[in-house]
UniProtKB/Swiss-Prot annotation:
One GO biological process term: mRNA processing
Job description of the protein: Usually encoded in the trnK tRNA gene intron. Probably assists in splicing its own and other chloroplast group II introns.
Native species: Paeonia suffruticosa
This protein's UniProt keywords: Chloroplast, mRNA processing, Plastid, RNA-binding, tRNA processing
Subcellular location: Plastid, Chloroplast
A Pfam family: MatK_N
UniProt GO molecular function: RNA binding
Main location: plastid
Record's keyword annotation contains tRNA processing: yes
Lineage: Eukaryota, Viridiplantae, Streptophyta, Embryophyta, Tracheophyta
UniProt record similarity statement: Belongs to the intron maturase 2 family. MatK subfamily.
Cellular component terms per the entry's GO annotation: chloroplast
HAMAP family from the UniProt entry: MatK
Name of this protein: Maturase K
């Protein structure tokens, strides 16, 4: 009931375009704490619960409700180490709570509730990460060239705030955002390290602005010939001065229309990179490349070098992104044909989109988290004295399950079996270290039960694909499985 009441208050505040009062609500910080736990696969931060205790949250809200509540970040108080620690904690809590608030305009829950009143546009880009790969499986086999694009960062933090003004109309919230950006953070690099979640949200909202422009151009190309470029450029998505972009469009407007009318152009974005694939020639891809660079510089004041956009032919290039190595390879196929008394062989080549997991970077991520060494030999993790055996096993099984879910689309399962072996033996070494016994004797006592814990999830998933009656298909299934409920990449998979 309390959670429903909280959503009603959020809905009420958003209907009045006034989100700032939500920063004083305790459930905002509870939501931030819950989402922080869900996003962390390793859960190594043992003081996370203490950091978000109810007493600390109430103390923070009380201080913010004072007349000069931002004096808690005063530089004079930072001379005392105790106050400096508290100020850093308060700053982190406010920034994480602020992310919950500014994400409201992008939430599907509120988009659906406000769609009838036409207050905001409906966003269709809130999709699973795994939805990229089925799309590539269906489309990339028919394409010839691909561009790997490193999306540039804005040169100034104020550009990010300006991009957010259309989505968040509450001036007080924008002033609070500027306070975080310019008072507590001196540069984009320091801001991304101190407030990673807020930085990712602002970066994604900034990138979405020029992506929405591309979507508009793609959908409206059939109507642009009867619309003057000046009137077109006055649309609400553009915020800054438009004289530079008008010059770009005025040079060769018909050529730009021809460029956007490519029906075989596909665009995919992931993290700080994007992929632009087309069936056309390399000349068309080069025109896209320089148009993107000019568009970033003239409209969004973002400087980008031509080297950040590389063009490759799909037949001899592999896509390394999101923990997978994807490539288009030719499978030779010999077909014997019989015509009357004559028989002959026909050689065919079939294109296949192959997706595999990179084992070496994944082992490097496990080694960084101290589950194994750089050679892949399992290591024991230090266990807390008050942790039970079931808690330790559950933690390792959760990590193994998340990795198996994320990399379940691989066409070769041998790499996943190696990762499961490392985690299973690391779990056994951790338990043996806790009980001060040998690993061999501990595995003899708990080996079968521990193995069942790590393999139960795979059996449940495959049983949804094949019924238990078809035991042969159930045992021999080696195809990829894509989960359409994965909305964030886990820490171990993010080895780019």
């Amino acid at each position: 009931m309390e959670k429903s009441q909280g959503y009603l208050e959020l809905d009420k505040s958003w209907r009045h375009d006034f989100l700032y009062p939500l920063i004083f609500q305790e459930y905002i910080y509870a939501l931030a704490h819950e989402q922080g736990l869900n996003r962390s696969i390793l859960l190594e931060n043992t003081d996370h619960d203490n950091k978000y205790s109810s007493l600390i949250v109430k103390r923070l809200i009380t201080r913010m409700q004072q007349q000069n509540h931002f004096l808690i970040f005063d530089n004079d108080s930072n001379q005392n180490p105790f106050w400096k620690h508290n100020n850093n904690l308060y700053s982190q809590m406010i920034s994480e709570g602020f992310v919950i608030i500014v994400e409201i305009p992008f939430s599907p829950r509120f988009v659906d509730s406000l769609e009838e009143k036409k207050k905001i546009l409906k966003f269709n880009n809130l999709r699973s990460i795994h939805s990229i790969f089925p799309f590539l499986e269906d489309q990339i086999l028919h394409l010839n060239f691909v561009s790997n694009i490193l999306i540039p960062y804005p040169i100034h933090l104020e550009i990010v705030v300006q991009s957010l003004r259309y989505r968040v109309k509450d001036a007080s919230s924008l002033h609070l955002l500027r306070f975080f950006l310019f008072t507590l953070n001196k540069s984009i690099s320091s801001f991304s390290k101190r407030n990673p979640r807020l930085f990712l949200f602002l970066y994604n909202s900034h990138v979405y602005e020029y992506e929405s422009t591309f979507l508009f151009l793609r959908n409206k190309t059939s109507h642009l010939r009867s619309t003057s470029s000046g009137a077109f450029l006055e649309r609400i998505f553009f915020y800054g001065k438009i004289k530079h972009l008008i010059e770009v469009f005025a040079n060769d407007f018909q050529a730009i229309l021809w460029l956007f009318k490519d029906p075989f152009m596909h665009y995919v974005r992931y993290q700080g990179k994007s992929i632009l694939a087309s069936k056309r020639t390399s000349l068309r891809m080069n025109k896209w490349k320089y148009y993107l660079i000019n568009f970033w510089q003239c409209q969004f004041y973002v400087w980008s070098q031509p080297g950040r956009v590389s063009i490759n032919q799909l037949s001899n290039h592999s896509l390394d992104f999101l923990g997978y190595l994807s490539s288009v390879r030719l499978n030779p196929l010999a077909v014997r044909s019989q015509m009357l008394e004559n028989s002959f062989l026909t050689d065919n080549a079939i294109k296949k989109f192959d997706i595999i997991v990179l084992l070496i970077p994944l082992i490097g991520s496990l080694a960084k988290a101290k589950f194994c060494n750089v050679l892949g030999h399992p290591l024991s993790k230090p266990a807390r004295a008050d942790s039970s055996d079931s808690d330790i096993i559950e933690r390792f099984v959760r990590i193994c399950r998340n990795l198996s879910h994320y990399h379940s689309g691989s066409s070769k399962k041998k790499s996943l079996y190696r990762i499961k072996y490392i985690l299973r033996l690391s779990c056994a070494r951790t338990l043996a270290r806790k009980h001060k016994t040998a690993v061999r004797s501990f595995l003899k006592r708990l080996g079968s039960e521990l193995l069942e814990e790590f393999l139960t999830e795979d059996g449940q998933v495959i049983s949804l694909i094949f019924p238990r009656t078809s035991s042969t298909s159930w045992r021999l299934y080696r195809g990829g499985i894509w989960y359409l409920d994965i909305t964030c990449i886990n820490d171990l998979a993010n080895h780019e």
